[in-house]
């Protein structure tokens, strides 16, 4: 790796032991020989896991890289605007993080007599993290060199001529690391999900196997195909890991109140320790100097911190009615912003701002309320920010509600971040079973039905929905409903792009651009604005021929120009190809 040949970046830790000598020189005696040293080093590696930053929205706005959010600062990859250097940062980040993990393995010298369960669990965390970062690179680049050993600054150019493993070999390596992790890790209950644990490793393994299994199925006849199609093997691994996960006694989080409240609590709470469904999560505390600004951004109506944006009508239309029936998006009722949310899947109501929902504490934010504007009522009317400025402006009429802390007034954000949930495992199991044609009532009850009933949606046997997303190939009703459920359950959590890539879903991207709510003159949405703001909206917001918001019509007149023969993978950085002559560039780059 070029960055290895040039220099090894320093890795900071709170441990005095690790601060004494550069970690790139293990020969100097920097061995990890005791429990405290091991724990301090592993604690530092947690910085590489997903987090909310002190600025911006983090994962909440990440899905502008998909069909869930449309943004003025759109994703270059979707529009075919990546270049040969577009993968450089992801490549470097991935291998730098792997370098840090492998430094641990290289210098782990704890005597066997001192390897108690706690020390071994820390070692399991390292295996998990090595799997995690190889998976990240696999998704982005496909076939990659496996970094299963420590490459220090003394590595020679000749020593770095390492061929890439085929993608299925990489996936097998990742799963083998997760077997090691699972066998060493404590269960979730030991640290209430605040540390990497056995159950989190199982769900990560299911996600890896599902990704590879479906990639190999749907890309079997294109330039991104694996040299050996092992789709059924990997899908079978999802089932194997899932069967073990089912034995762990985990339940979906529920409350005795409104079903939607349980789903919302997963994302708007400060403490997730009592929610066993959240297998791994990140805690924030101003008292400990660890906080974020997600609450402040959501309070302001921000969907993308880089500019104006909005949740798409496509995502809104994905959700079922609460009685389990499909919606007909052509029904006139959906031209009414308020009626759009009535009688729907409670997850829609908890994910997208709607009538009566608060952007923050009621003491500082007026609940969203649409009503025909009059001077007498102007102080109680609070429509979406279609007439806003900068990044508070909505392009579609749909703001983010997921994660809003309705007790937040001002200052630092402290809502926790779920990293891995049990629900992901249920969705992976359901999809693998359907792909393997082993769907049954028992599997439905454990997965799809359980998720819908927790959300407050009646479970109906899957049937064909004529209005469901057209992927360009035939889906069984079961797969249709599983894909719908993934989008509903995992919206705005960073999964959608990965799903589109593994499903070979370029038909949902090429020539498409996200649209928004109905904004005709007679709509309650439009009538809720003052005359000045109505004029402003008409000057700034493009509508399609049927009066639905089409905000990117001028910028993307022909829709996204994703290159289906190239953009499913990122380009390997030119510097890496120059250094390692055994690497081969990805298709069409």
Task: Give residue spans per PLM region.
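C-terminal motif of bacterial Sec signal peptides marking the signal peptidase cleavage site
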Residues: 11-13
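An aromatic- and glycine-enriched ligand-binding surface/loop that stacks and positions planar moieties
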Residues: 15-74, 144, 148, 180, ...
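Conserved, well-structured interaction surfaces
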Residues: 34-50, 71-141, 157-193, 337, ...
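Long, intrinsically disordered, low-complexity segments
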Residues: 94-97, 173-175, 259-321, 412, ...
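A glycine-rich, coil/turn loop motif that links secondary-structure elements
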Residues: 117-124, 190-201, 257-259, 470-472
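Structural register within alpha-helical repeat arrays
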Residues: 123, 130, 205, 212, ...
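C-terminal substrate/ligand-recognition segments
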Residues: 341-453
């Amino acid at each position: 790796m070029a960055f290895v040949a040039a220099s090894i970046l320093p890795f900071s830790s709170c441990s005095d032991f690790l601060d004494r000598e550069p970690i790139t020189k293990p020969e100097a005696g920097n061995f990890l020989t005791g429990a405290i040293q091991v724990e301090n080093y592993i604690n530092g590696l947690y910085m590489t896991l997903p987090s909310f930053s002190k600025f911006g929205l983090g994962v909440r706005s990440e899905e502008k890289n998909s069909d869930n959010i449309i943004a003025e600062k759109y994703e270059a990859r979707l529009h075919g605007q990546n270049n040969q250097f577009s993968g450089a940062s992801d490549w470097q980040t991935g291998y730098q993080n792997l370098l840090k993990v492998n430094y641990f393995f290289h210098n782990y010298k704890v005597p066997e007599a001192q390897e108690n369960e706690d020390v071994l669990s820390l070692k399991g965390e390292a295996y998990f993290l090595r799997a995690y970062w190889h998976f990240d690179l696999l998704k982005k680049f496909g076939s990659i060199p496996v970094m299963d050993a420590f490459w220090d600054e003394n590595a020679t150019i000749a020593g770095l001529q390492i061929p890439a493993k085929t993608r299925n070999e990489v996936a097998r390596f990742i799963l083998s690391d997760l077997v090691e992790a699972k066998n060493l890790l404590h269960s979730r209950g030991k640290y209430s999900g605040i540390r990497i644990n056995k159950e989190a490793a199982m769900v990560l393994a299911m996600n890896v196997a599902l990704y590879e299994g479906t990639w190999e199925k749907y890309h079997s006849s294109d330039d991104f195909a694996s040299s050996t199609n092992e789709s059924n093997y990997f899908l079978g691994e999802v089932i194997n890991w899932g069967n073990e996960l089912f034995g762990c006694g985990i339940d979906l989080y529920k409350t005795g109140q409104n079903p939607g409240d349980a789903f919302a609590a997963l994302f708007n709470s400060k403490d997730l320790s009592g929610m066993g469904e959240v297998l791994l999560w990140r805690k924030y505390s101003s008292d400990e100097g660890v906080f974020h600004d997600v609450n402040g951004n959501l309070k302001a109506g921000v969907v993308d911190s880089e500019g104006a944006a909005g949740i798409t009508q496509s995502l809104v239309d994905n959700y079922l009615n609460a009685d389990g029936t499909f919606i007909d998006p052509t029904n006139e009722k959906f031209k009414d912003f308020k009626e759009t949310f009535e009688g729907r899947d409670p997850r829609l109501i908890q994910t997208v701002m709607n009538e009566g929902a608060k952007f923050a504490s009621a003491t500082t934010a007026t609940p969203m309320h649409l009503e025909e504007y009059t001077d007498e009522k102007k102080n109680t009317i609070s429509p979406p920010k279609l007439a806003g400025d900068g990044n508070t402006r909505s392009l579609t009429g749909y703001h983010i509600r997921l994660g809003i802390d309705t007790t937040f007034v001002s200052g630092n954000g402290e809502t926790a971040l779920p990293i891995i949930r049990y629900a992901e495992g249920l969705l992976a199991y359901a999809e693998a079973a359907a792909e393997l044609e082993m769907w049954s009532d028992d599997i439905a009850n454990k997965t799809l039905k359980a998720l819908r009933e927790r959300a407050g949606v009646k479970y109906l046997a899957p049937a064909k929905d004529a209005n469901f997303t057209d992927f360009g190939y035939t889906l069984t009703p079961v797969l249709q409903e599983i894909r719908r459920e993934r989008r509903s359950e995992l919206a705005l959590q960073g999964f959608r792009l990965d799903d589109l890539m593994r499903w070979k879903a370029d038909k949902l991207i090429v020539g498409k651009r996200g649209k928004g709510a109905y904004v005709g003159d007679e709509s309650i949405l439009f009538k809720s604005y003052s005359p000045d703001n109505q004029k402003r909206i008409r000057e700034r917001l493009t509508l399609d021929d049927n009066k639905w918001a089409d905000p990117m019509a001028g910028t993307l007149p022909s829709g996204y120009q994703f290159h289906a023969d190239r953009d499913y993978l990122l380009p390997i950085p030119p510097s890496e190809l120059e250094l390692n002559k055994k690497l081969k560039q990805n298709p069409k780059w």
